[in-house]
Regions:
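Conserved catalytic/switch belt of AAA+ P-loop NTPases
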Residues: 12-36
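Conserved RecA-like P-loop NTPase ATPase core
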Residues: 3, 15, 62, 100, ...
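Conserved P-loop NTPase "ATPase switch" module shared by AAA+ and STAND
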Residues: 1-11
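Glycine-rich, phosphate-binding/catalytic loops in enzymes
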Residues: 16-19, 45-49, 233-234
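Accessory nucleic acid-recognition modules appended to NTPase machines
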Residues: 110-245
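Interdomain motor-coupling "hinge/lid" segment immediately C-terminal to the ATP-binding subdomain
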Residues: 39-152, 156
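Residue-level signal for well-ordered alpha-helical positions
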Residues: 14, 44, 65, 228-229
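Structural recognition of the conserved hydrophobic beta-strand(s) that form the central parallel beta-sheet
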Residues: 2, 26-33, 53, 62
Length: 245
């Protein structure tokens, strides 16, 4: 297991060469928290290395959901009938959304510590990671404003032009469309922003092509942290919770 290998990309080619020599599978696991600079890799690794994008923990993985309903079963058997009851209350779900699926938050010893993980993550992204990803100097305040715009528009089909106006209107922030897209691209490479692509069960339907992506993050707790919400305030804003959950 080699963690954060993207900080030393030569590891990729070294692993590829070693795999060719041994002619065995399942020998190495390379993990990283952001996208590697592909120009530093000599070979794609096709046929030797498979890529898998992972996310934060689901309620089933954190052992909070009873897992009695399977999405796969619902698709495989549309006529299936079931009578199950969630063990989680609305307050439990609100807290889970505010806390997020971060392993450090799930395993935290107190609720206060659990809720601080997402806030710390956002601060690190805005103050450090946004520049470390490719060495380009970026404005931490502008980064935060762009993320806040995403948070306000989470789970909606908000257009880029709409969010750009939102950013510019905040604190007289100056931002052009190319600059906005540069920041968004960097945040996507950091796996912070993860929009949900259009989906339609009718594969050949034009609706799939015409529908835009819904705005989203790798974890709902990021939106909560950016909007300055708490489990208590979220209980008074169930409509907002619906978009976040």
């Amino acid at each position: 297991l080699i963690d954060e290998w993207q900080d030393y990309p030569v590891i990729w080619d070294a692993v590829r060469i070693e795999v060719d020599k041994r002619q065995l599978s399942g020998q190495f696991i390379l993990t990283g928290s952001n996208v590697v600079d592909e120009t530093q890799i000599r070979h794609s690794g096709t046929g030797r290395i498979s890529r898998l994008q992972m996310g934060t923990m689901s309620l089933w993985e954190s052992q909070e959901s009873n897992g009695l309903i399977s999405l796969k079963e619902l698709f495989d058997n549309p006529q299936m009938e079931f009578e199950v009851l969630s063990t989680l209350s609305v307050d439990d779900l609100i807290f889970a959304a505010c806390r997020g699926g971060w392993p450090a938050a799930v395993c935290a010893k107190s609720k206060k510590a659990a809720l601080s993980v997402a806030r710390d993550y956002v601060n690190t992204v805005c103050n450090s990671d946004i520049m470390r990803i490719d060495g380009v100097r970026r404005n931490s305040q502008l980064t935060r404003q762009i993320l806040r715009s995403y948070a306000r528009n989470i789970s909606t089909l908000a257009k880029t032009s709409q969010m750009l106006q939102d950013v510019v209107a905040s604190d007289d922030m100056d931002c052009t469309r190319p600059t906005f897209m540069d920041y968004v691209n960097a945040l996507e490479r950091l796996f912070v922003i993860q929009d949900v692509g259009a989906w339609c069960p009718a594969i050949r339907s034009k609706t799939t092509i015409r529908s835009g992506a819904k705005r989203g993050f790798c974890d709902p707790s990021i939106a909560v942290a950016l909007l300055g919400l708490t489990p208590e305030s979220m209980q008074m804003q169930l409509n907002t919770f619906g978009f976040i959950f």
